[in-house]
Amino acid sequence: MTESEKRKSRITTRTLQRMRDRGERITMLTAYDFPTAKILDEAGVDVLLVGDTVGMVVQGHSTTLPVTMDQMIYHAEMVGRAADHAMVVVDLPFPDGQLDLLHSVRCGARVLKETQCHAVKLEGGAEQAERIEAMVGAGIPVMAHIGLRPQNIHVEGGYRLQRDIERLVADAKAAEAAGAFTVLIECVPSEAAAAITDAVKVPTIGIGAGRDVSGQVLVTHDILGLTSGYTPKFTRLFADVGNTIREAAKSYCDEVKAASFPSDAESFE
């Protein structure tokens, strides 16, 4: 799909499927606010993810677990208003994707009704098949998330590379059979991601999953140098915006201290 074609219509589940079928890579980045989402949308990003990673990169938590459904709705509303062309997917936070089926369906319905967003992301594979089917049956598109599942951190004992190819393929196939329109694969060996992609007909989106997938997703703060502390092996710094902000703030402080800001041109008579 050319940039001009992207500008003509909204990216949908069908768009993503067509892209996968013709071998066109899908791009996906996180967004949590209006101005960032607007810039990413204008740049031609196919899918914006309002991730529960907001808990770590914006709120300062060490995990995604403290994030609430109301907080996800708050951020999703801003991103939904900003995106004119990108598809917007919203995470179901812990434990809203793990409680009873009706609760999850209601949370997914809130996303579609209140935020102008288009789908939800649900962590889990085979064990979530019934939930995925219930949500899709209620008219809520679901992106399944397999491999490393951050909401499962305490069960796994940390963030660990997932190597069980047989289980990963089974998870992907179960999610596809239940109606998931895409499978996101996190932190698995390239060989596993390739096997998953070959095993399903829906698009696969990788994060730390190598090249042999239908598309890629990263945390926007990571690629812009806005994340303090640990940066995952699988990310890449595309622009050091964090340092630019730091230098701009320092220059502002220096000029205010020196009484060189504001100048006459920046003042009213």
From Swiss-Prot:
Pfam (any one): Pantoate_transf
Binding, Mg(2+): D52, D91, E123
Gene Ontology BP terms: pantothenate biosynthetic process
Binding residues annotated for 3-methyl-2-oxobutanoate, in chain numbering: D52, T53, D91, K121
Domain of life: Bacteria
EC id: 2.1.2.11
Cofactor(s) of this protein: Mg(2+)
Location of the active site: E186 (proton acceptor)
Location in the cell: Cytoplasm
Record-level Gene Ontology MF annotations: 3-methyl-2-oxobutanoate hydroxymethyltransferase activity; magnesium ion binding
Enzyme superclass (EC): transferase
Disulfide bonds: none
GO CC annotation: cytoplasm
SUPFAM superfamilies: Phosphoenolpyruvate/pyruvate domain
Record keywords, A-Z: Cytoplasm, Magnesium, Metal-binding, Pantothenate biosynthesis, Transferase
Catalyzed reactions: 3-methyl-2-oxobutanoate + (6R)-5,10-methylene-5,6,7,8-tetrahydrofolate + H2O = 2-dehydropantoate + (6S)-5,6,7,8-tetrahydrofolate
Alphabetized InterPro entries for the sequence: Pantoate_hydroxy_MeTrfase (IPR003700), Pyrv/PenolPyrv_kinase-like_dom (IPR015813), Pyrv_kinase-like_dom_sf (IPR040442)
Pathway recorded for this protein: Cofactor biosynthesis; (R)-pantothenate biosynthesis; (R)-pantoate from 3-methyl-2-oxobutanoate: step 1/2
The record's free-text note on cofactor binding: Binds 1 Mg(2+) ion per subunit.
PANTHER family linked to this entry: 3-METHYL-2-OXOBUTANOATE HYDROXYMETHYLTRANSFERASE
Subunit structure and binding partners: Homodecamer; pentamer of dimers.
Family listed: Belongs to the PanB family.
Protein name per its UniProtKB record: 3-methyl-2-oxobutanoate hydroxymethyltransferase
Species this chain originates from: Rhodopirellula baltica (strain DSM 10527 / NCIMB 13988 / SH1)
